[in-house]
Curated annotation (Swiss-Prot):
Keywords associated with the record: Cytoplasm, Phosphoprotein, Repeat
Superkingdom classification of source: Eukaryota
Region (4 X 11 AA tandem repeats of [EGS]-K-T-K-[EQ]-[GQ]-V-X(4)): 20-67
Record-stated family: Belongs to the synuclein family.
The protein, known as: Beta-synuclein
GO CC term (a single one): cytoplasm
UniProt note on tissues of expression: Specifically present in synapses around neurons but not in glial cells.
Source organism (scientific name): Bos taurus
Function per UniProt: May be involved in neuronal plasticity.
Organism lineage: Eukaryota, Metazoa, Chordata, Craniata, Vertebrata
Sequence repeat ranges, renumbered to this chain: 20-30, 31-41, 42-56, 57-67
Residues bearing the modification Phosphoserine: S118
Biased amino acid composition, Acidic residues: 98-134
Keyword Protein biosynthesis attributed: no
Length: 134
């Protein structure tokens, strides 16, 4: 009987040790998983921020080019229609610089709404969740 009890005791110790190792292994695995997820999340966030900044810069550049073309075109139209003489049109202005300044300056007065029109958000109906049909 002594041998039997000693054998069970040893088995019990082995099970406890295995459980402890398993618990430790699961904890380590969970910690590494968490680190991995946080790493991927931070890299994704950096990529998104960099992408948004890049798109914003390209948009600003394109707006500057478009503004320059509009400015130049407006001068040509004004001269062609006789509103101003070609000689009176300032020659030292560079359309790209004027467009760049216009893009960087904030509006002095906010844009006004046309009379009688309202741009308030319409009330939303309550969201209703639908279950897919089987």
């Amino acid at each position: 009987m002594d041998v039997f009890m000693k054998g069970l005791s040893m088995a019990k110790e082995g099970v406890v040790a295995a459980a402890e190792k398993t618990k430790q292994g699961v904890t380590e695995a969970a910690e590494k998983t968490k680190e991995g997820v946080l790493y991927v999340g931070s890299k994704t966030k950096e990529g998104v921020v960099q992408g948004v900044a890049s798109v914003a810069e390209k948009t600003k550049e394109q707006a500057s080019h478009l503004g320059g073309a509009v400015f130049s075109g407006a001068g040509n139209i004004a001269a062609a229609t006789g509103l101003v003489k070609k000689e009176e049109f300032p020659t030292d202005l560079k359309p790209e610089e004027v467009a760049q300044e216009a893009a960087e300056e904030p509006l002095i007065e906010p844009l006004m709404e046309p009379e009688g029109e309202s741009y308030e958000e319409q009330p939303q109906e309550e969201y209703q969740e639908y279950e897919p049909e089987a």
